[in-house]
């Protein structure tokens, strides 16, 4: 969900 790969 953001600029990196989190669980978002």
From Swiss-Prot:
Modified positions (Leucine amide) in chain numbering: 8
Subcellular location: Secreted
GO biological process: neuropeptide signaling pathway
Keyword ATP-binding in annotation: no
GO CC terms, sorted: extracellular region
Keywords: Amidation, Neuropeptide, Secreted
Keyword S-adenosyl-L-methionine found: no
Family: Belongs to the allatostatin family.
Primary role: May act as a neurotransmitter or neuromodulator.
Record protein name field: Carcinustatin-16
């Amino acid at each position: 969900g953001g600029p990196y790969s989190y669980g978002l």
